[in-house]
């Protein structure tokens, strides 16, 4: 749950 603007793989 975040912003996949910088890291789409880390948008947890």
Curated annotation (Swiss-Prot):
GO molecular function term, any single one: aspartic-type endopeptidase activity
Q: Does the keyword Hydrolase apply?
A: yes
What's a single GO BP term from this record?
A: proteolysis
**What does UniProt note about where in the body, tissue by tissue, this protein is expressed?**
Chorionic epithelium (trophectoderm) and placental cotyledons.
Q: What class of enzyme is it?
A: hydrolase
EC no. given is 3.4.23.-
Q: Name one GO cellular component term.
A: extracellular region
Coiled-coil ranges from the UniProt annotation? none
Question: Which residues have a glycan attached per UniProt?
Answer: 4
Annotated compartments? Secreted, Extracellular space
Keywords from the UniProt entry: Aspartyl protease, Glycoprotein, Hydrolase, Protease, Secreted
Family in the record? Belongs to the peptidase A1 family.
Q: Please, what other remarks does the record include?
A: On the 2D-gel the determined pI of this protein is: 5.5, its MW is: 55 kDa.
Recorded protein name is Pregnancy-associated glycoprotein 55E
Which organism does this sequence originate in? Answer: Bison bonasus
Upper lineage is: Eukaryota, Metazoa, Chordata, Craniata, Vertebrata
């Amino acid at each position: 749950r975040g912003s996949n603007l910088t890291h789409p793989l880390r948008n947890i």
